[in-house]
């Protein structure tokens, strides 16, 4: 049995398969999921698990060179915005509609139970060397 890191087998598999510049998404429970992208649905009920907890665990296991978030998160969900800013990773902000379009390029979308507005982030894989 695995002792450390992410126990969810689907998330662990996706993270292990990422190459440089591949993307995954951590999403709130309302983000539309493109039909061509794998959805790893963690949602149990509204708010569980929350966006920040999932983001924290994924970032502990993944080298990220860039995060992409909706411009609207700055004003509509300031606490989520602050959590993103606290990560010391470059962030590119784009309008929510553009962010949604960009999710079709992701290897997977991890759906949380988060219900804060615009609590979505695209993580672009970096390299560990």
UniProtKB/Swiss-Prot annotation:
GO terms for cellular component: cytosol. Its EC number is 5.4.99.62. The active site is at residue 20. One of its GO terms (biological process) is D-ribose catabolic process. Catalyzes the interconversion of beta-pyran and beta-furan forms of D-ribose. Pfam families: RbsD_FucU. Pathway: Carbohydrate metabolism; D-ribose degradation; D-ribose 5-phosphate from beta-D-ribopyranose: step 1/2. This is D-ribose pyranase. It comes from Shouchella clausii (strain KSM-K16). Substrate binds at residues 28, 96, 118-120. Keywords: Carbohydrate metabolism, Cytoplasm, Isomerase.
């Amino acid at each position: 049995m695995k002792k450390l890191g992410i126990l969810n087998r689907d998330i662990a598999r996706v993270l292990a398969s990422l190459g440089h510049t591949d993307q995954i998404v951590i999403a709130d429970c309302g983000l539309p999921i493109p039909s061509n992208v794998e959805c790893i649905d963690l949602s149990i009920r509204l708010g569980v698990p929350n966006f920040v907890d999932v983001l924290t665990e994924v970032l502990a296991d993944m080298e990220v060179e860039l995060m992409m978030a909706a411009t609207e998160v700055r004003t509509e969900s300031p606490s989520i915005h602050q959590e993103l800013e606290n990560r010391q990773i470059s962030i590119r902000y784009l309008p929510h509609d553009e962010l949604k379009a960009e999710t079709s390029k992701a290897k997977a979308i991890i759906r949380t139970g988060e219900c804060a507005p615009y609590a979505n982030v695209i993580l672009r894989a970096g390299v560990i060397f």
